């Protein structure tokens, strides 16, 4: 190693819930100071630098759409192995705003929100406030205030129909960095 003092001072923690992915990672990532965690409650009380490299876009999201001035939560209705469709059900957006503690619907017609993203950000920021540190988020996203539908399905490096290839593709979305900054306030 070119930086032995730095290497010896670092303790690497990898958050991974999947046993299969842990097995693959342990095979490919070697080091005595590496530990795998299933949740952030197992962190040490030490200064930490969190690196979220395409982490948040893998978390499940909820979508909300305003139609005729009424908010709806978007669901996927399974019809058969080869057919699904969107189903929009009326939703009281104030419930979501109570949860996030700000008016998320202000000047919006579409919202993508991940409850898990909010939870992880809160846990990470609590750790940073107590123990010092920082966070680097590396992901596809946008900074505009107006949220949009960014959900996408990718299979074999090509975009596919989200409703048709969900069992054989990577379903992801672009992060709203504006929303993340609002969650962090």
Where are the language model's segments positioned?
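SAM cofactor-binding core of SAM-dependent methyltransferases
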Residues: 1-43
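Class I S-adenosyl-L-methionine
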Residues: 35, 44-47, 51-185
């Amino acid at each position: 190693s070119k930086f032995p003092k730095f290497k010896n001072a670092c303790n690497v923690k990898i958050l991974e819930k999947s046993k299969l992915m842990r097995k693959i990672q342990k095979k490919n990532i070697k080091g005595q100071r590496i530990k795998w965690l299933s949740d952030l409650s197992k962190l040490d009380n030490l200064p930490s630098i969190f690196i979220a490299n395409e982490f948040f876009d893998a978390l499940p999201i909820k979508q909300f759409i305003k139609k005729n001035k009424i908010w709806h939560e978007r669901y996927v209705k399974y019809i058969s192995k080869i057919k699904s469709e969107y189903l929009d059900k009326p939703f009281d957006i104030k419930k979501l705003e109570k949860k996030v503690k700000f008016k998320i619907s202000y000047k919006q017609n579409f919202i993508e929100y991940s409850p898990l993203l909010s939870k992880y950000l809160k846990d990470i920021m609590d750790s940073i406030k107590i123990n010092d540190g920082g966070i680097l988020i590396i992901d596809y996203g946008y900074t505009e205030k107006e949220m949009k539908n960014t959900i996408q399905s990718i299979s074999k490096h090509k975009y596919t129909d989200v409703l048709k290839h969900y069992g054989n593709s990577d379903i992801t979305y672009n992060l709203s960095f504006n929303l993340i900054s609002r969650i962090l306030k």
